[in-house]
Amino acid sequence: MDEQITGGYSEPCGQCAAVDWGVSDEGQFFCKSCHNVIEKIREVEDVTSLHHKHGRISIVRKPKKKKHDSEREWLVCEGFQFILKHQAKALVSLGVCMKFETEVLWNFWKRYLQNTRQAFTENPVSTARFEVFMKSQSGSESDTQSHQSCYSEASSDTEMSVSGISVDGRSAVSSESLHSIPQKGRRGRVSNLMSMPRTLAMCYLALLWVREAITLTDLLRMVAEGHIPYLHLHETFPAEMRMFGKDVQIFRVLFFPSYAFIKKEALVLAKIMKLPSFPTISQDCLFHPVPLTVRYLLEANLPDALHVWVQKVITGAGMDSDSFLTFDPTDKKPHLLSYDVQAVAVIIVAMKLLFKLDDHVEWKLSHDAAKKKNNKVFSLERWFNIVQPVLEQARLKEEQEEARRQWNFANPFITNLKRKSLVLKKRRVTDHLQQRFQKFADPAPEQSTSTTNSHTSFRFSWGEEEGSDGPSMFNQNLDCTVKAKAVNGLANQRYWHPELRICPENKCVSHFSKFEPSLPRMFVWVLDLFSFILGVLQSDVYEEVLNVERRFLKKNYRLDSRLTSSHLKKKKGPIL
């Protein structure tokens, strides 16, 4: 029987050079001398065809892919543990204490794995019920793939994935990772599984626990500048952790997460890990608004004399108490403060107290300061003329660096073997065009300073030293703004603010875009300055300013005559 099928095939064996072929039960050709299996076409007649005398069906059966000795099945949580380890080492190299890496972050990670039942538990997350569900959705999948699809949450009606992309049961695991399955369920509920943004959220929680002087905006900026590994970090995985299929979506980074998103993820992680109350934020901690506002006064080139009024706002709003500042995940409604955004919001409220920022009073006070022979008097107009061009130049530089950022991977991800050649061809064409256009546009592009210079917490440098952005105004006084003979000590006797009505719970949205056209231009510019310094949206700073004003006015209206007027008038909202 074998001779009839192999009679027309006389090619020698590639292993032993013999011409003695047989056909296995699966239709594969094999050498009877050395038992070498080849990918030979077996031709059979198709009797159902109209031209069955000449019709033939070609059947090719490829041998199963052999697993290399260096490869092994690995868990997705192993990949995230590898990422957290590298991020922690980068933070320690930047000056963070060793306790952050060896004790706090490791304990957080262990609590996370235990509470999500991925490790350190006798009842792991892979349940028999979930495996049965996957088999019912894809009967053609092998038993091995069904057992691999176990990275799920123990919920009653959801199907989870680490990648955050919903897929059906038929597209189960096609990679070396055990846990590459959908993270969102049929009802779209977010699971407790780890993601790339959540690695940053966990690092931030650990930094907050050890009370390191690194705010969330500092962390995100270090990530964007490449000082903390985040982009293309999967390329440093060990050789045995080969990525393919759904693993691509898990570790793929297409953009940097926003401030608000990381803060939200930090709250979720704190709830998952069931963390106790964090260490107290006292005045000796740099997360406290008193020392933190000094930093941002230096950053914005504002006078140190303004800090006296900043402290009055902090005290008047009750924002210096330990209970208000300390993060406690055990509360019924835990609230994680935006310490950095809150600090600049306090500065803006203090500036409104002194200069009003209504496009009239601040310029009048600046003209009065210009008449003084003493150059140590702070003029807001001069401050604006110094800071504005520096801000525009820094913004342009940031846009250029963002345009140069390489989001593509050194080695393209292959999600489907059938598309491998197409993906590789597209990458070759893209790289070729990029090189050609780069030579045409800029023969010698400047290397980004963010990857060559050491990290600094300040965006601007003010002073008389070489390389500074402009003259410093930190030591100037506020003689034209603070009047000793005035009713409340301020040249500005009125305080304006937008509507302070609080939105209903769970329906709160930013109203900045709605009110921005009617707001004074100087106030909007100050919002823009501090939003650039922090790397957040103007709306984030605006909403935090409203929060500070609500607390400050609620506690001081008609109670503190030194900071409020005795009459309430209406002009652009309530006037104090």
Curated annotation (Swiss-Prot):
Residues 40-70 are annotated as: B-reader. Pfam families: Rrn7_cyclin_C, Rrn7_cyclin_N, Zn_ribbon_RRN7. The keyword Transmembrane does not apply. The keyword Transcription applies. One of its GO terms (biological process) is RNA polymerase I preinitiation complex assembly. It is found in: Nucleus, Nucleolus. Residues 247-357 are annotated as: C-terminal cyclin fold. It comes from the Eukaryota. Component of RNA polymerase I core factor complex that acts as a GTF2B/TFIIB-like factor and plays a key role in multiple steps during transcription initiation such as pre-initiation complex (PIC) assembly and postpolymerase recruitment events in polymerase I (Pol I) transcription. Binds rDNA promoters and plays a role in Pol I recruitment. This is TATA box-binding protein-associated factor RNA polymerase I subunit B. A zinc finger (RRN7-type) spans 6-39. Keywords: DNA-binding, Metal-binding, Nucleus, Transcription, Transcription regulation, Zinc, Zinc-finger. One of its GO terms (cellular component) is RNA polymerase transcription factor SL1 complex. Although it shares weak sequence similarity with GTF2B/TFIIB, displays a similar subdomain organization as GTF2B/TFIIB, with a N-terminal zinc finger, a connecting region (composed of B-reader and B-linker regions), followed by 2 cyclin folds. The RRN7-type zinc finger plays an essential postrecruitment role in Pol I transcription at a step preceding synthesis of the first 40 nucleotides. The gene is taf1b. Transmembrane segments: none annotated. Residues 137-157 are annotated as: Disordered.
